[in-house]
């Protein structure tokens, strides 16, 4: 999860988030090299006393500064498209959970079970226990099995919302009348926090998301106790 004065991303918990971190580093290195080259050229132009005022045409230079940016853009676009298609791919999910956005809480329904659904509200600051996080804790966590492909169906009952969990690389818009889907898979157990990421009204800041990823045996015991 995030911590105060954090400069980087949250620790990756899913294969998608790991790919996004690699892509970020890849793109940042390209930007760093381009910035260094531009800074070097500017410094050279400001410090050199040599001038060349008779140059009217330079086909070679124009060819290079046309082709080189195109190659750089391709090197950025290809891995980006690969990750984009990976995020849209849904292959034989082991579990499907439907989440609906409301003003201002989330409701969840485990569609593979006959009657397993609940609402998830933020716990008010006055009711927090020692060690719990302000504006991030909820009364009902979403319990999910780790190391399994899970399909999330996301929609809204009223206005636009956005269901986002950064450490899993998830951010899916909740749109009234439309059902969006995304997949998640956690490589380790733990608590993972998110929030509504679309301005949805006066209490937009009070719509936290808490996923608790557990081993399959614990998930089965929990689901049996909820039925």
UniProtKB/Swiss-Prot annotation:
Top-level taxon in the UniProt lineage: Eukaryota
Chief place where the protein resides: mitochondrion
GO biological process, one term: ATP synthesis coupled electron transport
Topology versus the membrane: Multi-pass membrane protein
Mitochondrial intermembrane side of membrane: 1-14, 88-227
UniProt GO MF annotations: copper ion binding; cytochrome-c oxidase activity
First-tier enzyme category under EC: translocase
Positions of Mg(2+) binding: 198
Cofactor(s) needed by this chain: Cu cation
Alphabetized UniProt keyword annotations: Copper, Electron transport, Magnesium, Membrane, Metal-binding, Mitochondrion, Mitochondrion inner membrane, Respiratory chain, Translocase, Transmembrane, Transmembrane helix, Transport
Coiled coil (UniProt feature): none
Enzyme Commission code: 7.1.1.9
Catalysed reactions, semicolon-separated: 4 Fe(II)-[cytochrome c] + O2 + 8 H(+)(in) = 4 Fe(III)-[cytochrome c] + 2 H2O + 4 H(+)(out)
Transmembrane segments: 15-45, 60-87
Compartments it resides in: Mitochondrion inner membrane
Pfam families: COX2, COX2_TM
Subunit structure: Component of the cytochrome c oxidase (complex IV, CIV), a multisubunit enzyme composed of 14 subunits. The complex is composed of a catalytic core of 3 subunits MT-CO1, MT-CO2 and MT-CO3, encoded in the mitochondrial DNA, and 11 supernumerary subunits COX4I, COX5A, COX5B, COX6A, COX6B, COX6C, COX7A, COX7B, COX7C, COX8 and NDUFA4, which are encoded in the nuclear genome.
UniProt similarity note: Belongs to the cytochrome c oxidase subunit 2 family.
Protein name, as recorded: Cytochrome c oxidase subunit 2
Native source organism of the sequence: Balaenoptera borealis (Sei whale)
């Amino acid at each position: 999860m995030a911590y105060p004065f954090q400069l980087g991303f949250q620790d990756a918990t899913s294969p998608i988030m790991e790919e996004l971190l690699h892509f970020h580093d890849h793109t940042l290195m390209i930007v760093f090299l381009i910035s260094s080259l531009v800074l070097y050229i500017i410094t050279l132009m400001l410090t050199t006393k040599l001038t060349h005022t008779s140059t009217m045409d330079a086909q070679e230079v124009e060819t290079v500064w046309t082709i080189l940016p195109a190659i750089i853009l391709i090197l950025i676009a290809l891995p980006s498209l690969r990750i984009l298609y990976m995020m849209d791919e849904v292959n034989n999910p082991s579990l499907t959970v439907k989440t609906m956005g409301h003003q201002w809480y989330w409701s969840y329904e485990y569609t593979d079970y006959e009657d397993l659904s609940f609402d998830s509200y933020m716990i008010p600051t006055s009711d927090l226990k020692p060690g719990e996080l302000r504006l991030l804790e909820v009364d009902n966590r979403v319990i999910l099995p780790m190391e399994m492909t899970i399909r999330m169906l996301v929609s809204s009952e009223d206005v636009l919302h956005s269901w986002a969990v950064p450490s899993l690389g998830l951010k899916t818009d909740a749109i009234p009348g439309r059902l969006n889907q995304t997949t998640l898979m956690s490589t380790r157990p733990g608590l993972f926090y998110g929030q509504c990421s679309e301005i949805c009204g006066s209490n937009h800041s009070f719509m936290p998301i808490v996923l608790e990823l557990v081993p399959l045996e614990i998930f089965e015991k929990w689901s049996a106790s909820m039925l």
